Structures are given as structure tokens and as C-alpha cells.
Amino acid sequence: MSALVPIVIEQTNRGERAYDIYSRLLKDRIVILSGEITDDIASLIVAQLLFLEAEDPDKDIYLYINSPGGSVTAGFAIYDTIQYIKPDVSTICVGMAASMGAFLLAAGAKGKRFALPNSEIMIHQPIGGVRGQATDIKIHAEWILKIKQRINRILAERTGQPIEVIERDTERDFFMTAEEALKYGIIDKVIERRP
């Protein structure tokens, strides 16, 4: 069942114009990442980021995150695009940023990473499941360990935490309040109202 997407009506000098809510928000350079991070979702987010860069490479983009995480490769596609494009991307956690969602929250431009006061943030090591021959299982296990090291290294860079702290904390699910995420370095400020 697909979710109901609200339509907003806007008055222009040419009359009324109807937009779905996400298209209207995109006009204000707001991108919404909600739900599981899949390849399809990553493609949509990447396309919106690239579009907004083409529209105005000097104006900030606002990425609102409410996600339990998802595919590591899909998350890396979004992360790399955030780093690649010229505009600063401000990240804002509303609700939850867990796993790859928390990773992307930390990916925002330094000084422009926020969470609302009742947000929850969770980091952990990547999860993988593979079946097959012993050799294939070994190959996948070695690969996921490399991914784990890459995620930990980037989290250490983005948060300012020593790699040893990141390795310890991501060994299991590590939950944080917005205030704790601020102290940890995942975000730069807890915000209650727009400035």
C-alpha cells in the first residue's frame, strides 16, 4: 500500500499550481530521507542533491533524516554525493537516525548538523547475512570487516572521536539522545525552533 502524499496549492501570477508536498519542499531546497535506505531511495536522494546543486551551487541544501538505516552501499552513495557536491548539506534528525541514518546525519557540513530535542541516534557495526559455500562466506566476512573499518574511520573523522572509541561503541547498538549525540560529535546543535 502506498502512502498518501499531500498536495499543496500555491497561488502564482499564472493562477493556482498544485504540487505534491515533496516537490514543494524541494523548491525550498529541503530533501526528506524517511524510512529504510534502499538503492531506490538513494537514487532519489542523489538525484535531488544533484538537481539542487545545478539550480544553485552556492546555496545550502537541507536534508531531513528519519531513518532506521538500511543498505550500506546505498548509504555510501548518498554520503559520497553529499561530499561531492558544492553546496553545503545541512543534516537535521527528526525522530530517529539509526545505523546508516546516523552515519548520514554525521555527514552534513560541520557546524550545520542538527537534531530536534526528542530525536534518537544509534550507531553500530554493519550487519550482513550470507549463505553459500564456505569459501564464499569467508569472502563476504572479509568484505564486511573492510566495510566496518571504513565506516568506523569516517565516523571518527566526522565526530572527532578517537577510532578506538568508535570501534568500541559500534561493537553493539549504541543509542544516544540528541544531547548525547551533540557531546559525541555526530551533530553540532540540538534545535527546538527555527532561528
Curated annotation (Swiss-Prot):
GO biological process, one term: protein quality control for misfolded or incompletely synthesized proteins
Name of one Pfam family that matches: CLP_protease
Catalytic reaction list: Hydrolysis of proteins to small peptides in the presence of ATP and magnesium. alpha-casein is the usual test substrate. In the absence of ATP, only oligopeptides shorter than five residues are hydrolyzed (such as succinyl-Leu-Tyr-|-NHMec, and Leu-Tyr-Leu-|-Tyr-Trp, in which cleavage of the -Tyr-|-Leu- and -Tyr-|-Trp bonds also occurs)
Annotated compartments: Cytoplasm
Any one cellular-component term (Gene Ontology): endopeptidase Clp complex
Gene Ontology MF annotations: ATP-dependent peptidase activity; ATPase binding; serine-type endopeptidase activity
Main localization (coarse): cytoplasm
EC numbers on record: 3.4.21.92
Keywords: Cytoplasm, Hydrolase, Protease, Serine protease
Domain of life: Bacteria
PANTHER family in the record: ATP-DEPENDENT CLP PROTEASE PROTEOLYTIC SUBUNIT
Family: Belongs to the peptidase S14 family.
Entry function: Cleaves peptides in various proteins in a process that requires ATP hydrolysis. Has a chymotrypsin-like activity. Plays a major role in the degradation of misfolded proteins.
Protein name: ATP-dependent Clp protease proteolytic subunit
Organism annotation: Caldicellulosiruptor saccharolyticus (strain ATCC 43494 / DSM 8903 / Tp8T 6331)
